[in-house]
């Protein structure tokens, strides 16, 4: 780095060596005792070009910061220094000898140098020597003079709107006769001008350093030494090479405390205002501005994910499901209960269309515990009664879980139906959400008297009533679903056994008969039959023995003609493509059965 000796023109001044922080440029200082606004007259053309270049760079950085594009660490820390680098010829508010400051040689290293610039210009040396010449980059001896000279710089800034130069600038220290008055008068003069500043939006304010600023701004000269001493690097190069977050924040503190520029250059106005917003509102509570900046919250999982994960475990462990749901927020649990009801409804309808009784896939669970699934619900409802918000979402799920169980208990005893029906009723009454939210309850309870009327109108409950009564409506439903059978095997015998089973359902053997009922539907579920294969009438006359005889007959011709006579379609024997025992050629069928190992000869 080049060194240059600066010989100020003041009386009693002694030369001070200043280390330039730029690679190829050296700083020159002209110190005068009269106030002069021709601040750049003494600069060389190279230096002026550098200043113009830096001005453009900082202008672009400022516009970037206004649009929120620049990074948080570098930009807020550097922009205040950009303004602070402006001082060139500064009249002191005290009317003492003027201090002229020149910027150091400029290079495009704007961001880091600007962040490195302001703390290392302490005035200790100049103060002791009694001159207002440039000090070395040494530790800060008296920071009040530092603050004073920076405020003087800011007071003269409007004169040079185009010179944004964030390099380490040389600040002159006033004579040692006025070290104490310095901080007070510039601050007063600058605070008068603060009204012009436009506060930045809250998202751009610096929150952390405010407390330090507010503490240091109103204090007297003795206290003001604290903030600058936080940032005393050994040299400005060191500061440039380490523009870390902590340094930039501390730099921000000192700059915005000392700086109250009334009319900064146009390009930098929002940035300057941001830097000074904290000193302006030093009376405010610094914590009040911390709130808007807490933006990034961890995203919660949407409620349907919880629902999908808990659906399988709910049937097996309702208590666990309930405890998990009570932790959820009431809004989320409301959504969950709604979507859970929708899922159940869709499941019911799908089971109806397949002709299956509801919850047939888990008969063991509900059959083994027809009452135990209701009793825990009662206790749970009583626990939840103080919190109806939580009881509402949880109750529908429990109710719908217990309904199949209650229905099966009722199906086993339709004759004394009013007794069991009134049994579950008082148990479910403690939770108001049960009856209200689960619409199947009012219909499933009065089974015996209203069986015929309740069977057909409500669609969601028809799957439920299938299990619970043996009225003609039930046989209609079963007969309709029988058309889904692949073959007519055992159809009429199934209907006859159903008739025989109807008296059994009122006895204690209800569970066995119920399982007997389920097994054909399991067959139907595993072997779906195309709808184009005809209606139940086609299979009405088929008997099990007759079908076995047909299988064992040798003449496929006679079989096919039999099928044709029954089907009333005069087709040649081998053209039929029906997937039924009537039209299939016997040889193909026997071959297939042999391959499957189902036909023994």
UniProtKB/Swiss-Prot annotation:
Induction, as annotated: Expression is up-regulated by androgen, but not by glucocorticoids.
Chain intervals with Low complexity compositional bias: 20-39, 174-190, 384-414
Keyword Phosphoprotein assigned: yes
Biological source species: Homo sapiens
GO cellular component, one term: cytosol
Ranges of Basic and acidic residues composition bias in the record: 203-213, 342-352, 585-601
Name of a matching Pfam family: SARG
Principal location class: cytoplasm
Family: Belongs to the SARG family.
Gene (name only): SARG
Tissue and organ distribution: Highly expressed in prostate.
Subcellular location: Cytoplasm
Compositionally biased intervals (Pro residues): 415-429
Keywords: Cytoplasm, Phosphoprotein, Receptor
Residues the record lists as Phosphoserine modifications: 131, 133, 519
InterPro entries: SARG (IPR026152)
Region listing for Disordered, in residue ranges: 1-41, 56-538, 551-601
UniProt keyword Metal-binding present: no
Coiled-coil region list: none
Amino acid composition bias (Polar residues), ranges on this chain: 100-118, 142-157, 224-236, 307-316, 464-485
Function: Putative androgen-specific receptor.
Protein name per its UniProtKB record: Specifically androgen-regulated gene protein
